[in-house]
């Protein structure tokens, strides 16, 4: 199949199945993989409190929810500007751009899930938000925020 025919076929097959594409993003160590495991109801994504980052490239997880809605969640590489070094940081940005571009070929991005650590909004947090929401998705995709690490916080509810 030629490239454009294959892309058209993939676009139609994904959209006919009513699949929603969701990108989960945030800094390194905020718990993106734990959110995936919570949604799955079991451990499907590697997590670690010892390693700087478990996710080295965007990983896809497919879920079918009651009612038949299919969701593909892409767990992205965590960004940590000061600690990553310039080359790994730029590589992560290139990978994020490639992910968004490839999803636009098959129906687009339906939702951004921004994972943040409770009580910790840093410059990197703000820049990560700007990169995904404003730059890569043109402020044109619905966004929801997931706040993690609230176990020790008082009066959060």
Language model region names:
Residues 40-72, 95-98:
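Switch I (effector-binding) loop of TRAFAC-class P-loop GTPase G-domains
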Residues 22-26, 58, 73, 111-117, ...:
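Short, structured motif recognition centered on aromatic/hydrophobic residues
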Residues 84-120, 130-144:
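Inter-motif core of Ras-like GTPase G domains
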Residues 78-84:
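AAA+ P-loop NTPase catalytic core and its hallmark functional loops
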Residues 1-27, 97:
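Short, flexible boundary segments at extreme N-termini or domain junctions of P-loop NTPases and their
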Residues 20-48:
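Glycine-rich phosphate-binding P-loop
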Residues 150-157:
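GTPase G-domain guanine-specificity segment
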Residues 13, 19, 23, 29-30, ...:
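Short, low-complexity cationic-aromatic patches
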């Amino acid at each position: 199949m030629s490239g454009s025919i294959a892309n058209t076929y993939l676009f139609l097959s994904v959209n006919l199945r009513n699949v929603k594409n969701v990108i989960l993003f945030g800094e390194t160590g905020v718990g993106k993989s734990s959110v995936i495991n919570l949604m799955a109801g079991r451990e499907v994504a590697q997590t670690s409190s010892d390693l700087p980052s478990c996710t080295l490239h965007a990983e896809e997880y497919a879920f079918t929810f009651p009612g038949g809605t299919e969701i593909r969640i892409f767990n992205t590489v965590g960004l940590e500007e000061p600690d990553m070094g310039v080359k790994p940081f730029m590589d992560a940005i290139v990978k994020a751009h490639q992910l968004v571009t490839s999803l636009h070929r098959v129906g687009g991005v339906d939702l951004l899930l921004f994972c943040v650590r409770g009580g910790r909004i840093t410059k990197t947090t703000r820049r990560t938000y700007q990169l995904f929401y404003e730059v890569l998705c043109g402020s044109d995709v619905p966004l929801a925020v997931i706040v993690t690490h609230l176990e020790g916080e008082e009066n959060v509810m």
